[in-house]
UniProtKB/Swiss-Prot annotation:
One of its GO terms (biological process) is 'de novo' NAD biosynthetic process from L-aspartate. This is L-aspartate oxidase. Its EC number is 1.4.3.16. Binds 1 FAD per subunit. It comes from Mycobacterium leprae (strain TN). Pfam families: FAD_binding_2, Succ_DH_flav_C. Belongs to the FAD-dependent oxidoreductase 2 family. NadB subfamily. The gene is nadB. Coiled coil: none annotated. InterPro entries: FAD-dep_OxRdtase_2_FAD-bd, FAD/NAD-bd_sf, Fum_R/Succ_DH_flav-like_C_sf, Fum_Rdtase/Succ_DH_flav-like_C, NadB, Succ_DH/fumarate_Rdtase_cat_sf. Transmembrane segments: none annotated. It is found in: Cytoplasm. Its cofactor is FAD.
Amino acid sequence: MAVPDWKHAADVVVIGTGVAGLAAALAAHRAGRNVVVLTKADQRRGETATHYAQGGIAVVLPGSDDSVDAHASDTLAAGAGMCNLDTVYSIVAEGYHAVTELVGYGARFDESIPGRWAVTCEGGHSRRRIVHAGGDATGAEVQRALDHAADVLDIRTSHLALRVLHDGTVVNGVSVLNPNGWGIVSAPSVILASGGLGHLYGATTNPEGSTGDGIALALWAGVAVSDLEFIQFHPTMLFAAGTGTGGRRPLVTEAIRGEGAILLDSKGNSVTSGVHPLGDLAPRDVVAAAIDARLKATGDSCVYLDARGIDGFASRFPTVTAACRTVGIDPAREPIPVVPGAHYSCGGIVTDAYGQTELAGLFAAGEVARTGMHGANRLASNSLLEGLVVGGRAGRAAAAHAAAAGRAYVSKLEPVTHHALKRRELQRVMSRDAAVMRNAAGLQRLSDTLAEAPIRHVTGRRDFEDVALTLTARAVAAAALARNESRGCHHCTEYPDTAPEHARSTVIRLADDQNLVRAEALATVG
């Protein structure tokens, strides 16, 4: 075992500073544990997916015409038979408490009248239950409030988590790279809240750090991941000619359709007419697939979101308005050009509803986790809800585990040979073979390409991210190849129908040689 350049000890290590990470860290801190938060970002308040979330938080408000049953029913319908019923009800029922706790941190939501939150509707919801802030800047307000509350925490910037350390039975820390070199943070509890994997693709709504790090860390630790074939492509990502082939692109929030905007093709025809009873407000997987099919049929580069009928658009949706104006579009006068874009991973590290994985002391929360909340397709505005609820639960559970486990000791760190494709090449083959529509031949071609990735020596963040992306891509391809049907976010041209016998999750693990990925039946966690 190499001698580390530095060492540190904590009770709980949290990796990530978005909604789930900070909710977890604050909960563990309130429980009296010594918490260290690691972020690979180079500034205290780094770029997170939470910050860019526009729509809002889906929550059942007391005294409304809504109910936990109704919200759960909508979530289950969107999840296409793949949600965990108990998890869904558990998280939805705790939503209002989690949001009021966020208000206690200083978050302020838009009001319809003084003292009453304004609510809107989004795709797949049967009620107006989406609370929002700043019109379409909810995520920024959630992040602001959590960042303010997190001033009490020990947050380490430019700290890249390389491996979760364990003895095969329990966690004992994290291997980390920072500007001072390679080091170890020993801890009996580790919480992965590192976000998503959008940069598997050339165009995504995700921030630059969404490179599948948590999925790779879990696989290297021998922990199961599941449902990775269900990658949600948001139907409406802003399209502008000449914006390049890669990187983050602005989201055009679903709430705009909730307020009456309609999707049209270049000839003025409805994109979703006859596709789903909810039309433009159908679940995201349905709308994204409809747009993708229309673009393939017409050869057009984009479809259009016509929001000209919405009064006061600029004040209701200032974030979208600003993004549109940046590329010379005035939403009040012309339709907004949009395309589907990689947005959210419905699957992830297998956990229970409290963030516990199969490895004692390892927890996961937020987009990186697969709790069973989202199934095959996430319902709009359920992500911030899950991050708040499960993040808080994971923090409390990690604190309790740390108190019971006592001090952690790192025994040894086995060397690992890493492989990675170049980022642009990886994104090209993923966008070609594992995007909105897939087929078996393309997925096999993708798997073969990924298997031939050359050795990459990790000397910094970019190398590590490419390694993590490549391993995550292999897991996505393996999961997609194992699903011989179309369901939720997974659309397979050879199998266009949903097969009841396939209403089960596919688990992916790393083989003992740390090289091959295999699929197996899902085992119950917790």
